[in-house]
Amino acid sequence: MLAWYRAHRTPELTRVAEALAVIGGVQVLPLITLAIVAGLYRAGARAHALFLALAVGGATLLNVVTKLIFQRPRPDVLEAVLREPGFSFPSGHAMANAAFGIAITLIFWRSRAGWPVAVLGAVWAVLVGVSRNYLGVHYPSDVLAGALSSLVWVVGLYLLMGQFRPSLRGSPAGERDNR
């Protein structure tokens, strides 16, 4: 699959993939997450703010620990557009962005923005994951493992927190379920 991506690289697609890597990476995604956490907190949706922070932060911590356990080398550097430090499995970009997309979907699901947020979150996570393969810095299994790990982590966290913070299951804006 990585050979297919390499054979279909174009300068335009490479620029898009590199931009996704930056936005979904350690410099920008945490700032986006913190901005949304702050907005939720200011809006009085403290359980939602805590959930988003724990979802993305916990996925990041889980990723670091998992990489240290498996220590899988990255794909051949000759295949890659970028050079990334550290181990390959699971993809940190895929894991953090999937956690972000799933968490904001769960937060806004009962609001009017539910479907658009769900679609945007899913599309975003898929685009970031595909970009990691396109750039040659991860195997497809790294991306899949990162996304699935985040799915299990974030949904499990949501169910657990919902037991102790029932307000988490409502809309952050206090809207009624319009479905």
Cite the ranges covered by each PLM segment.
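Membrane-interface helix caps of multi-pass small-molecule transporters
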Residues: 4, 64-65, 159
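Hydrophobic alpha-helical transmembrane segments of polytopic
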Residues: 25, 29-36, 56, 117, ...
